[in-house]
C-alpha cells in the first residue's frame, strides 16, 4: 500500500484485513468509538406486553428466518411482523418510540415479535448485514440505502418465567435479561455510521425452560 492508501484504511478484527474507508458496512476495528447499550425501564406496561403477544398470536407466527428469508440452524424461534396499521395500540407504540428517540417513524421497520420456546436460541450475529453479501445489497435497496442503525428490543415476559435466554454481547462482556416492559437500545454501527462495529455482535442464549417473548424494532436512519 502507498502512504496515501494506508491513510485511508482501518484495521478490522475480521482476519486483520485492511479495508478502504470507502468499503461501507464492513467490520471495523474494535477500538473505534461505539455507544454502549441503553436500558429504558417500564417502556411498556405489563398489559401492553401481553397485548403485543396476543396480537402476534392472532396474526400467526412463522419459523424465524435469517439472511435472505432463509431458515437457519443459527436461530430457532417463531416470528410475527406487525405494522402500525394492524392495531390502534401499534400506531401509538410507533409514536412512543419516535418521541423517545427523536427519530421519525418513517425510518422504522415493522415490529418483529419473537417467541422462544424451550431449547430456542439465536446464535451470535450482527443485526446489520455486510454489504459484500448479495442479499444485503437488495435489502438496502428496499430501504432506500439506509442500514439498520439501531435495534430497539423490548422484553415482553417476566424473566422469572423462563430460564436462560439472556441477550449476551461478548465483546462488551454484558448480558441482559430484563424485567417485563424494559427496552434495550443498542447501536449496530460505529459512531460514524459507516461500519459495523464488533461490539454490536450479540446472541440470544438458549432458553432452558419456559417461554421467552421479545420484540425488535429496527431503525434505519
Enumerate the language-model features and the residues they cover.
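Fe(II)/2-oxoglutarate oxygenase catalytic core
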Residues: 1-221
Amino acid at each position: 500500500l502507498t502512504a496515501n492508501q494506508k491513510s485511508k484504511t482501518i484495521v478490522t478484527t475480521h482476519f486483520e484485513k485492511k479495508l478502504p474507508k470507502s468499503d461501507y458496512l464492513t467490520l471495523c476495528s474494535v477500538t473505534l468509538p461505539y455507544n454502549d447499550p441503553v436500558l429504558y425501564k417500564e417502556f411498556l406496561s405489563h398489559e401492553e406486553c401481553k397485548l403485543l403477544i396476543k396480537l402476534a398470536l392472532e396474526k400467526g407466527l412463522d419459523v424465524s428466518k435469517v439472511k435472505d428469508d432463509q431458515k437457519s440452524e443459527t436461530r430457532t424461534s417463531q416470528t410475527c411482523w406487525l405494522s402500525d396499521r394492524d392495531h390502534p395500540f401499534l400506531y401509538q407504540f410507533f409514536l412512543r418510540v419516535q418521541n423517545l428517540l427523536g427519530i421519525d417513524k418513517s425510518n422504522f421497520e415493522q415490529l418483529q415479535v419473537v417467541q422462544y420456546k424451550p431449547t430456542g436460541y439465536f446464535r451470535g450475529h450482527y443485526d446489520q448485514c455486510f454489504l459484500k453479501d448479495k442479499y444485503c445489497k437488495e435489502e438496502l435497496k428496499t430501504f432506500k440505502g439506509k442500514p439498520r442503525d439501531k435495534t430497539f428490543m423490548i422484553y415482553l415476559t417476566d424473566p422469572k418465567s423462563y430460564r436462560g435466554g439472556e441477550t449476551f454481547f461478548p465483546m462488551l462482556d454484558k448480558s441482559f435479561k430484563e424485567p417485563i416492559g424494559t427496552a434495550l437500545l443498542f447501536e449496530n454501527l460505529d459512531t460514524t455510521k459507516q461500519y459495523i462495529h464488533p461490539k454490536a455482535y450479540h446472541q440470544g442464549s438458549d432458553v432452558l425452560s419456559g417461554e421467552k417473548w421479545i420484540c425488535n424494532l429496527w431503525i434505519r436512519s
